[in-house]
Amino acid sequence: MLEKEDIRSLLKELPSSPGVYRFYSIEKELIYVGKAKSLRKRVANYFTNKKNLDQKTRSMVRKIYHAEYTLVNSEYEALLLENNLIKENKPKYNVLLRDDKTYPFICLSSADFPTLTTTRKIDKKKGEYFGPYTSGRAMHSLVESLRKTFFIRTCDLNLTKQNIDAHKFKVCLEYHIGNCKGPCEGKQEKEDYDVSIIQVRNILKGNFSSVKKYYQEKMLSAAEDMQFEKAQFFKERYNSVLGLEKSSLIVNPDINNLEVYTIVKRLNRASVNFMSILHGSIIKARTIEMKAVLDETEEELLMHALFEIHEEGWDSTKEIICNIELPILSTYCKVSIPQRGDKKKLIDLSLKNAWHTLTRYDDQKKEKPEIRVLKTLQADLSLKELPAHIECFDNSNIQGTNPVAAMVCYKNGKPSKKDYRHFNIKTVEGPNDFASMYEIVYRRYKRMGEEGLPFPTLIIIDGGKGQLSFACQALKDLNIYGQIPIVSIAKNLEELFFPGDNDPLYLDKKSESLKLIQQIRDETHRFAITFHRQKRSKDALLKTEFENLVGIGPGTVKKLLTHFKTVKRIKEASIEQLTPVIGNSKATILFQQLNK
C-alpha cells in the first residue's frame, strides 16, 4: 500500500480537473481504472475516508502501490476514456467495484446458428463476448437492431443439422412478421446465416459503417416508397446506432489505427505523451519522463520514447500524428503535424498531459534527497512499504573473546543515534556468529514486542546466508516472520540475500540504494567495533587492577562494575557503600586491600 508520505505527495500533485486515474499493484498490474470530475477530490476519498469504504474497496486500496492519471477536457470525456481503458485492460477491481454491479455484455453464442443475448456473467465456453457496455438501454437497442437487420434468431432451439433434417421444429411468429428467415425448418441455409454473423461480429468490434449505411439506404428507400412509418422506424434504429457509436468514442469515429505523440522540453528534462486511437476510441495512454544527458534534441528524445513503447516494431501502426517533425518514421507509416480539426484536438489533449507531467517535476525536485533514496531502495528491493525505519545488526569478537554485537537505526534515511543499541552476548560460548545473530535479533524484537514499540520497516543483517537464516529463525520463534522485510549484505562482493532465495541480488555499484545500505552496514560495524574495544579495554583494566586482590573473584568484580560503572568509583567507595553490593565481609577485604 502507498505510504502516507506517498499519498500526500500524490494528492498534492493531482489537479482539480477532470481525468482518469489508474491504480497499479506492486507487480505493476493495472488493478483499477476510475473517472473523476476532480481528480484530487476523487482519489483523496480512497485514502482519507477509509471508514466509509466497503470491504472490497478497502482490499483494493491495500494493494495500491503506484498511481497514474490522464487529464481530459470534461467529465464526459473522462467517462468515455475510462470505459475504453476498462474494455482494453480489464482491470481486476473494476469488475468488483463498479458500484457493486457488473456491467452487461453482448454474447454471440457458439451454436451452429449463433444467437445474440445480453448477460452480466461471462462463460467463454458459451460464446464470444463484447463489452462491457455502460448504457444498458443502448446495448439492448443495438441487439434488437442487429437481430432485425440481419435476421438473427431469438429462440434457443438446438438447431443442429440432424434436428433440422428430422423436422423437429416449426417456425414461430418471428418468421411470420419478417424478423427471422426460419433456419429451424431449413428455410435459411447455414452459409447465408454465417454471412450475417460475420457482419454482426464486425459491428460489435466497432465497425459501425456497414450498419449505418444499411439503415440510411432502408430509410431513403422507405421514404421514396411513401412508407413513412417504416422510414421513421429505420431512422430511429439509425439514431440508436449513432448513439451507441458516440458512447464508445472520445474522438471522431473516422479516426482509426492512429497514434498520438507529443513532447515538451524544459532545459534538460522532457515529457513525452502517447495515446493510441482505435475506431475513434482512446484505448491506451501513457506519459514518459526523460532527461537529456548529452543535450539531445526533441526529435532524438521522442524517438527514444517511441522505441521503448514499440518494442516489437511498427508493423501495426498506420498513422502517427505529432507536434514535431519525425522524418525518420516517414518510411514506416504516415506522419503528420495536424493544424486543425479533430486530430489537432488530440494533439492539444496530449500536450496538456505532457506539460502537466513536466511541470510536476518542479515540485518533485524539492523532495528531500533522503526520501528520494529511500524510494529508490524501496523499488530496488521490491518492498511494499517505504523503508523509513531501518535497523542493521553486526557481531564483533576476536577468537571468541569479549563477544558483543551492535544495532544501529536509521529513520527517514538518517542515523537515529538515540536508538542505537549494543549487546553483550549471553547465551553463546566461543566464536559462533550464527548463534550470536540469533540471540541479538531475538532479544531486540522480543523486547520491542513487550514494550509495544513499532517494528522497523526493514532489517539488514551484516553477513551472508548463514547469518540471515539464523536471524529469520529468531523472527519465526517470535511469530513475526514475514511482518518485517529482512535482507543480508555479504562482504567483498556486496551481495544482497533474501530469505528463501539462493540467488543474490547485485545492485549497481553506483546506485544510491547500495550506497545507503553500505553506509548503514559500515556504521553498524563501526559501532560494534567501538563497543568491542571499550569492552576489551575495560576488561583489561579490571584484570590489571583486581587480579592480585585476595578473596575478590571475577563475579564480585562484575557486580561492582555493574553498580559503580568505573574502577575509579570503586576505589573511592566506602565500606558502607560497598557492603550492599558485595556483602560486609568482601567489602571489608576489598576496602583494606585498595587502601593499603
Curated annotation (Swiss-Prot):
SUPFAM superfamilies: C-terminal UvrC-binding domain of UvrB (SSF46600), GIY-YIG endonuclease (SSF82771), RuvA domain 2-like (SSF47781). Residues 16-95 form the GIY-YIG domain. One of its GO terms (cellular component) is excinuclease repair complex. Residues 209-244 form the UVR domain. Pfam families: GIY-YIG, UvrC_RNaseH, UvrC_RNaseH_dom. Keywords: Cytoplasm, DNA damage, DNA excision, DNA repair, Excision nuclease, SOS response. Its main location: cytoplasm. SMART domains: GIYc. GO terms for molecular function: DNA binding; excinuclease ABC activity. This is UvrABC system protein C. It comes from Cytophaga hutchinsonii (strain ATCC 33406 / DSM 1761 / CIP 103989 / NBRC 15051 / NCIMB 9469 / D465). The gene is uvrC.
